[in-house]
């Protein structure tokens, strides 16, 4: 089955709000204002927030994660707080700042400022704008996890001359119906909270549902195999403290509109694998219920000789 892919768009306007990357800096953050032509909303003002780590003259790799990821991937001298990809970005690791320039960015809509449908194609075009601002003509590689893998697919299609290789981890060419239904129920939980004037509770519950999809029954069996307790006249099972904490942490850092619109964006994603013309490594996790191995195999088959598959085993579904 083939899916239509949006045609590339012309570069939109932008106005720098931060200093250019300095060759003497190990890490730099920036924030620019741009006008982006969006598939479902026309021209819209957006903010493009990024962080670069590594030598300014090194080959550039973009690293993008799931909808909860952001521009800060790993602690460094300039920005010592913990990042979301500490295991990947470090000396001697797969992405070593000593030999690569690693660029990460906040997805448009992640700040909650866009309350309209956001396509993965919009994210790819926003990245192209960012590369223009930074004076980066071409990426050595785009490494994408989950939602980032979907954005990477769109970037490889819409801006194919600007990337040499794509690595797509846990991201297929279309959402699986089971995963789409799961996300739809999560969004309904948020909507129910909004009706009760308690949208943070709805968002917390949606995140708690998500944790069940990120973890396997085997892990829960090992970690939470304790008898339930009766607390204030209610039965409370062993995993509830963990789920409550995960929900609270997510609510503290995530605007509700950001969650809703980026969740929808996953379900909007559709591409024709044959349209990806760069060498692509697809990484699947065995037992992943949201991005099944069969879907990743379908993506690789559609890529033809340009695609290869790696399968990982993990306790995290």
Each language-model region and where it sits:
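N-terminal cap/lid subdomain of alpha/beta-hydrolase-fold enzymes
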Residues: 51-110
